[in-house]
């Protein structure tokens, strides 16, 4: 394991500081990064295709049409980069990249973000490219998909990516839950539209692909290689990225949801860069 001293945080800062809230608004090997020079590190969002029409492959929100892949993009990554720059010794490029799995430079990014894959459509070439990326040291974080049907869509893709591998729930004693911040459970972050100051945090089943099943419990599900390295995670029944994107929604939202989202982001990024 590489020296993690550069990743140490002043933990009390994130816990107690009043936030200066942001405005809303055959694959290559993953590159080895020098933790002492992370100005080269850019967050990358996966661009992918989806099946269906309005409400499936794309949706209307806040006066525009969104493709599924761009949910929370680019504000989530921009805010995460900004916060990491303020609260840690990490320096990230503020503007995230967008890449398809078949991009020739995919290995330049040690961590890929992917959002809302509940209606995902993929090609064999994309599956093969992601397989090579993961087997060569890359890491995939998939977020914001709720219920059984949306998970099944992503799992079908991963069966082609890693045909001899099966997901399993990442236990709470795994290092990813403890690299910097301590978690006793996977936090459940609802989309801003369903967030409240108290009470339930699960999103409603009617808002998601049928059959949704039970959405009450958030989990982290992972794919591990033969040596036990965690290669990919799906944060299921939660929307961590929205906690970054919507931090300006209000101080109560920041305290209840964004703080937990940023803590999880710090833990995941720390884990990826040190394993």
Segments from the language model and where they lie:
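N-terminal secretory signal peptides that target proteins for export/translocation
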Residues: 1-2
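Bacterial N-terminal signal peptides
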Residues: 5-16
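Loop/turn elements at helix/coil->beta-strand transitions in domains of secreted/extracellular proteins
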Residues: 39-41, 107-112, 136-139, 165-166, ...
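Short alpha-beta junction capping motif
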Residues: 43, 111-151
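An acidic, glycine-rich "communication" segment
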Residues: 51-59, 150-241, 245-246, 257, ...
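Surface-exposed patches in mature extracellular/periplasmic domains of secreted proteins
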Residues: 90-100, 142-146, 165-173
């Amino acid at each position: 394991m590489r020296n993690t001293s550069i990743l140490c945080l002043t933990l009390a800062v994130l816990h107690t500081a009043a936030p200066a809230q942001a405005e809303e608004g055959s694959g290559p090997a993953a590159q080895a990064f020098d933790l002492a020079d992370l100005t080269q590190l850019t967050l990358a969002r996966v661009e992918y295709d989806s099946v269906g029409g309005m409400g499936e492959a794309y949706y209307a929100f806040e006066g525009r049409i969104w493709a599924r892949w761009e949910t929370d993009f680019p504000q989530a990554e921009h805010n995460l980069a900004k916060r990491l720059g303020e609260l840690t010794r990490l320096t990230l490029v503020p503007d995230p990249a967008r890449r398809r799995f078949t991009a020739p430079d995919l290995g330049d990014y040690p961590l890929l973000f992917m959002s809302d894959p509940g209606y995902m459509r993929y090609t064999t070439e994309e599956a093969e490219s992601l397989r090579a990326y993961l087997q060569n040291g890359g890491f995939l974080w998939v977020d914001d998909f709720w219920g059984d049907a949306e998970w099944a869509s992503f799992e079908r893709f991963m069966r082609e990516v890693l045909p001899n591998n099966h997901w399993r729930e990442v236990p709470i004693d795994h290092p990813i839950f403890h690299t910097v911040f301590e978690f006793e459970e996977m936090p459940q972050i609802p989309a801003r539209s369903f967030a409240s100051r108290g009470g339930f945090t699960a999103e409603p089943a009617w808002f998601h692909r049928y059959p949704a099943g039970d959405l009450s419990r958030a989990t982290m599900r992972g794919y591990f290689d033969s040596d036990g390295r965690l290669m990919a995670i799906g944060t299921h029944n939660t929307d961590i990225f929205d906690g970054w994107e919507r931090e300006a929604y209000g101080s109560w939202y920041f305290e209840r949801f964004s703080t937990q989202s940023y803590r999880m982001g710090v833990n995941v990024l720390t884990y990826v860069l040190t394993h």
